[in-house]
Amino acid sequence: MWGQTNMVDKKSPLIAVSVGEASGDLLGAHLIRAIRKRCPQARLTGIGGELMKAEGFESLYDQERLAVRGFVEVVRRLPEILRIRRELVRDLLSLKPDVFVGIDAPDFNLGVAEKLKRAGIPTLHYVSPSVWAWRRERVGKIVHQVNRVLCLFPMEPQLYLDAGGRAEFVGHPMAQLMPLEDDRETARKTLGADVGIPVFALLPGSRVSEIDYMAPVFFQTALLLLERYPAARFLLPAATEATKRRLAEVLQRPEFAGLALTVTDRQSETVCRAADAVLVTSGTATLEVALCKRPMVISYKISPLTYAYVKRKIKVPHVGLPNILLGKEAVPELLQSEAKPEKLAAALADWYEHPDKVAALQQDFGALHLLLKKDTADLAARAVLEEAGC
């Protein structure tokens, strides 16, 4: 752990970062790289995943312990999550970082930020919560909790500005990093998939709790597609070692004995580019599929209690980011009771068998890519270092 210092050397600022899931780990890794380009001596600590640690980040706690989704699922783990948050606040108040950056995971990170801001430590939140979709009353509280919000989508900053806060659109890092052009042939060669066969990608989530709900449904869907397309190949990128282990456990069930599935270590972009169509849970992964210009079917199941709560609160007609950003149902969303293998398989087959529909969708996804494409990591790094006084 970095030692406490009474005098701050702005050439080597101590930057605290906290992430709660795999998508935040990716954002954090890009942010660290950009910070180090501007300030090579920066020191970084807090909570991070494997990608951040590969960039030299010192993680004080296991990021996987925070990776849960849904009201019921969070309640089960709440005592542990609250303990980690208390201990992180204690550690950071002792270390006195020059700035704190919470990346996504707002229910965890905004509580940390509020306590640190009260102690005089500048705070930023990177990735606005979906206040435009539900719980818009949170905006005023977030303005109180952090000094600045870094937004990934263009409709978000004005909500904070109207509430007297500071916010800016920095673009989405995936749009910056992913090429605009499509290259399915190269992706298939990389993964050893023949160009002439049907290829479907399965993305059942980056959290173990998501795998438990979605992997069995996705695997049953794959078996139905295999009946329709006997030569089909199925690809699945595992976000973390923990999800990879859980996927292996599900695949060992007798009902999936006939399913040949290629599980990759991450490589989600390559997997999506190689696919003719993608079955994906809601969340950031849907945007990655869109930026790969691939047709998709969005599906999600959570506990009935969680779903009933969310359905009452949500203020937008869609759950998938591509549909929300395009303002229409460009791709199917089959949720909860609609998330049946028969329906999912039929929707994926519809994309595979109608290339004209795919071509029109790719035009929409290309325009969306251009809208979100900025030098995101550098813009975020500049804001972080400004708040740190560098």
Curated annotation (Swiss-Prot):
Pfam families, per the entry: LpxB
A Gene Ontology cellular-component term: membrane
One GO biological process term: lipid A biosynthetic process
Enzyme Commission (EC) number: 2.4.1.182
UniProt GO molecular function: lipid-A-disaccharide synthase activity; phospholipid binding
Keywords: Glycosyltransferase, Lipid A biosynthesis, Lipid biosynthesis, Lipid metabolism, Transferase
Enzyme class: transferase
Pathway note: Bacterial outer membrane biogenesis; LPS lipid A biosynthesis
Catalytic activity from the UniProt record: a lipid X + a UDP-2-N,3-O-bis[(3R)-3-hydroxyacyl]-alpha-D-glucosamine = a lipid A disaccharide + UDP + H(+)
Entry annotated with the keyword Lipid biosynthesis: yes
Tree of life domain: Bacteria
Intrachain disulfide bonds: none
Role this protein plays: Condensation of UDP-2,3-diacylglucosamine and 2,3-diacylglucosamine-1-phosphate to form lipid A disaccharide, a precursor of lipid A, a phosphorylated glycolipid that anchors the lipopolysaccharide to the outer membrane of the cell.
Entry similarity comment: Belongs to the LpxB family.
Record protein name field: Lipid-A-disaccharide synthase
